[in-house]
Amino acid sequence: MMKLDEIIETLRQGKHVDEDSIYSLCVMAQELLMNESNVTHVDTPVTICGDIHGQLHDLLTLFAKSGGIEKNRYIFLGDFVDRGFYSLESFLLLVCYKLRYPDRIVLIRGNHETRQITKVYGFYDEVVRKYGNSNVWRYCCEVFDYLPLGAIVNNKVFCVHGGLSPDVLSINEIRTIDRKKEVPHEGAMCDLLWSDPEDVDTWSLSPRGAGFLFGQNEVDKFLHTNSVELIARAHQLVMEGYKEMFDGGLVTVWSAPNYCYRCGNVAAVLRIDDDMTKDYTIFEAVQARDSGGNVILPTKKPQMDYFL
């Protein structure tokens, strides 16, 4: 196996890592993640990051704009893969950082960290194109199964990919979920990864076909029950990079600028300081290139679907 720091530098350049090294990385990652709780405790200061979706060069910009992994703590809210041209390199870079700096980075599972979704939205095809088989995809999917479902910052900020669930009122209930499996089509684990905030009075069916829509009543109830001040989540494209809702009780953070190389949005990360103050850093996309090094030209009409 290549040395970890050598793999990190190779991935940062978007270059090929051999299959045996990836297998070893994924096995080590599973062993490390196996010992993490469903909801990981994180101290401040920390930087909270939203969806990445395989946009490696923008991920590198994210680290550059926010101080870097060597001196800062990070929480990534999931959706590392699919849609972008460098899903594998983006996910493996974060896995390497987790192995290199285990106390500095938390990787939460998103709705795209599943076998079913990655077979449809790009990650599976990317791996087969780059390696000629699906072995590396399988290794990564096994890591997905061990990713935690949430994080709690200073017992005051609850971090999750999607949102809330009618089956979960307390954070302690999330800790009892058996997470080490493919994401189910319904139930608490599914909802945490798929639900969205909306201006609704009560739980409503989601147009995504999974999870629920939830409003301020449910957010206020969750905040009060768990004595937390903020829900930080991702999962939805926000043109301005972040969006606060429900009197500041919830924020959506989006960290993939010019999403799908065509949407024209900026990206953001959220830093929570020791005194619990919030500071957003906004950044724009770098010039996107495909896996062959060719500049990607934006399409004229973005066509979005519900599986963000």
Swiss-Prot record:
Keywords: Cytoplasm, Hydrolase, Manganese, Metal-binding, Methylation, Nucleus, Protein phosphatase. The modification Leucine methyl ester is found at L308. Pfam families: Metallophos. Transmembrane segments: none annotated. Forms the histone H2A phosphatase complex in association with the regulatory subunits PSY2 and PSY4, which dephosphorylates H2AS128ph (gamma-H2A) that has been displaced from sites of DNA lesions in the double-stranded DNA break repair process. Dephosphorylation is necessary for efficient recovery from the DNA damage checkpoint. Gene3D superfamilies: 3.60.21.10. This is Serine/threonine-protein phosphatase 4 catalytic subunit.
